[in-house]
């Protein structure tokens, strides 16, 4: 910038790997494990001399982690896939999750609907709201049971204390959504080992 202070953008789960750099950011940091769907890792894009500063931290005191060849190869492959595979649109996400939402809405004490990404990205998710009095369970306990089943199922649980969870359907097939529905249905019916 005009004062010689580098602009660093923590883009975390953003989907566009170029827009912030092209808009003038000096360094842009992305999570390798979120939208890119790679291993636990990160990706830094930016001006050469600032990236060199980041690389020096490899030998620094208190570095966060030692990167192994498996992580590098995993992230490299994930980025390659991310840049070459067709992206699913929000409308396609809605189409995929509509039967899932309809099935969930047939369950007593469950209300499901499509919600759009709060940051304005073209991402639709399934929001599932549980009436805890009707289902006679805490949402947090249900989320834990879903994680601990034969098929581990994880949700966005930022609002679990309000009885709300979200399903991100980008990497999930229609068949997998049906499996998730049957697990929720079984747990609501009191089957502990569903």
Regions picked out by a protein language model, each given a short descriptive name:
Residues 91-102:
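N-terminal, charge-rich interaction modules
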Residues 14, 66, 85-93, 107-116, ...:
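Flexible, glycine/charged-enriched surface loops at secondary-structure junctions
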Residues 103-185:
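Conserved C-terminal alpha-helix-loop-beta "cap" of PLP-dependent enzymes
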Residues 186-194:
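Generic C-terminal helix-cap and adjacent flexible tail
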Residues 26, 60, 110, 152-153, ...:
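A general structural signal for well-ordered secondary-structure junctions
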Residues 81-88, 165-170:
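Glycine-rich phosphate/diphosphate-binding loops and the adjacent beta-loop-alpha structural elements
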Residues 1-83, 101-105, 113, 136, ...:
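Conserved PLP-enzyme active-site core in the AAT-like
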